[in-house]
Amino acid sequence: MNEDIEYIKTIDYTKSKLNIIANEISSAMNVTIKFEPIKEAQLGYYNYSGGEHKIFVDNSMSVEKQLSVLLHELGHRILHNRENELDKSQARREAEAESFAYVVGQQFGIDTPSGEYILPYIQGTDVKLKDIFEDVFKAVKNFNDKVQMKPMITSFIKYDNDIDNMKKL
């Protein structure tokens, strides 16, 4: 498994690949995804209104950072729907979303700074990592059941290898 992750890390994430990923996620997870400038001091946010799920990501960051933020906000979309939103503290919701981003990011070969964020969210609270991880792993399974990542990643690797081979000519 670790060899697969190291191999995936060779993917050169570009804006076009980010758009392919976003389109796949948007379709599979029933969420509108927008990359645009965000004036507030946040990198992205998830919004549910009028029966529509929306994720906004600040497009002024690197492509890998945008993907990381997209995955964090997608964690909110999957884990924090209207029914269970009030049952969880803000700290727990943020820790869950960041944990989701970390696990799925690893599948994409993206290093997320999740470790820096997860523990501070829950320090000084009664939130237990075990409880967070149970919910996160269910959410990751839900994501993996709906989003066809393997063909997408395989095509990215093939494309990058083809480009590398063309450069050698």
For the regions a language model picked out, list residue spans one by one.
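Active-site recognition of the HExxH zinc-binding catalytic motif
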Residues: 68-82, 97
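Non-Sec secretion/translocation targeting segments of pathogen effectors
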Residues: 97, 164-169
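Contiguous, non-catalytic segments that form substrate-binding/exosite surfaces or channel walls
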Residues: 1-55, 61
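Long, well-structured alpha-helical subdomains associated
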Residues: 102-166
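Active-site metal-coordination segments of metallo-dependent hydrolases
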Residues: 83-98, 106
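Short pre-active-site segment immediately N-terminal to the catalytic Zn-binding motif
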Residues: 51-70, 85-92
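Catalytic phosphate/metal-binding cores of nucleic-acid and nucleotide-processing enzymes, i.e., regions
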Residues: 26-31, 37-42, 50-53, 70, ...
